[in-house]
Amino acid sequence: YGEPIGVETLTK
């Protein structure tokens, strides 16, 4: 990670 701002976007 690095900056957890689009966690759901990454898990899509």
Curated annotation (Swiss-Prot):
One of its GO terms (cellular component) is proteasome core complex, alpha-subunit complex. It is found in: Cytoplasm. Keywords: Cytoplasm, Proteasome. Belongs to the peptidase T1A family. The proteasome is a multicatalytic proteinase complex which is characterized by its ability to cleave peptides with Arg, Phe, Tyr, Leu, and Glu adjacent to the leaving group at neutral or slightly basic pH. Composed of two subunits, alpha and beta. The complex is formed of four rings. The two outer rings are each composed of seven alpha subunits. The two inner rings are each composed of seven beta subunits. This is Proteasome subunit alpha.
